[in-house]
Amino acid sequence: NETLYATDYCGNVSGRDVDKFKELGLTPVKGDETGCHYIDECPINMECRVRHKIVLGSHELFIGEVVAAYVRDGVLTPEGRVNMSNLDLFTYVGPDYYSIGRKLGQYGYSVSSRS
């Protein structure tokens, strides 16, 4: 998974020392709202403005407001929902990465079978 590799690399290497876009062969695109660059190869990108910063010991947690979103063609269903089966999603639960996306059920399934 190239996206997983790039995510792990970007989380472990400082942008002060390395041009991560160049090193990983990623395409930077300048966002319309903030001017910050996002990664063209990602299926969904969001531009945010920082609203709060919380110091947590050796790290900081940033709370942002989404001001723009960019979604690649084919990611949304005709109804405008994210088509999870078209994405290879993962999450980080330190220190491990886990796959996301296998459909387990549909909202309301626990009560619909009781009728």
Language-model segments: which ranges?
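Basic, polyanion-binding surface patches
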Residues: 1-115
